[in-house]
Amino acid sequence: MKCSWREGNKIQLLENGEQYYPAVFKAIGEAQERIILETFIWFEDDVGKQLHAALLSAAQRGVKAEVLLDGYGSPDLSDEFVNELTAAGVVFRYYDPRPRLFGMRTNVFRRMHRKIVVVDARIAFIGGLNYSAEHMSSYGPEAKQDYAVRLEGPIVEDILQFELENLPGQSAARRWWRRHHKAEENRQPGEAQVLLVWRDNEEHRDDIERHYLKMLTQARREVIIANAYFFPGYRFLHALRKAARRGVRIKLIIQGEPDMPIVRVGARLLYNYLVKGGVQVFEYRRRPLHGKVALMDDHWATVGSSNLDPLSLSLNLEANVIIHDRNFNQTLRDNLNGIIAADCQQVDESMLPKRTWWNLTKSVLAFHFLRHFPALVGWLPAHTPRLAQVDPPAQPTMETQDRVETENTGMKS
């Protein structure tokens, strides 16, 4: 499948769980025919239970609902929680689950990291939010800062078709068959141009990174990137510095209070290279940053699931949308400039690690290890990802004598 730019779409930026979850649950609540939901994490907390209730209600009124969870990101849902959905008719699958080794999850590489919802070929959502209370401000200081978009219009056809053709584990023949079953056309008023881009381990290994690099090459005035896990490759870093040196204002927002300490260590290895190359680096300090968004000049923007690190750019299954729309670009710009002003600390030369031989050696070793990490993983034996579908719970059956008595008396004693 190869997607093209689609015109005439409506786009709404959704910030954090306070905006995202009500929009998703409302769309599911209004679904009439079909729901497809993919996510990396689904926790059995307050947010997860609300999603459970919304899907259960949809299935009970006859809506076809399909769920794909990552086997690493969502390993701990209870049997009761899942069985209630499958008993109602929800198709529930895990992407490449693996047994634990000494209580530890071992399937950390090549994960299904996408976050997509499609409802009735009419509405779609794509972004960085999982289904957990961690994305709500009520979670406290560790609540995550994140973004997604709600989409209406022809782009929804492409997202639905992508879902039908790219369910992990489908054979090539089945994907070919799917191409002859196109999504229904859905025309909605709107002006935004949108392109769906994704990363897989087959034909689209570097599509998302290529669009970022193209954007940096074409930028003329300003680029703002906010990304939770920032550790891209040489080409990306060189493109950032090259854009800055030709006069483009580059603002990079990264985690100042990361959920994993190694994230901050990795990003700080790049500070000397970026800051001295003219890139403005901002550490977001209010809470952990989980967003994956960017904008360029006054019309280009992207929102999705892809981080700018080795896992997302080289191993995981990811999905973003590229957006050409001045209004959306301005909305995202206002939001990002707002958090820069209120919640970020700019990295200046006084904050850069001292250039001692020891620090330089550590930086070089760590940088090359992290950057070549995907290639090292590539030496591991490859396998076809396995989809594990959860069967509905078996219905209890009455023993023969009980059945006879019930038929004779109309009741079971």
Model segments located where?
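Charged, low-complexity intrinsically disordered terminal segments
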Residues: 1-413
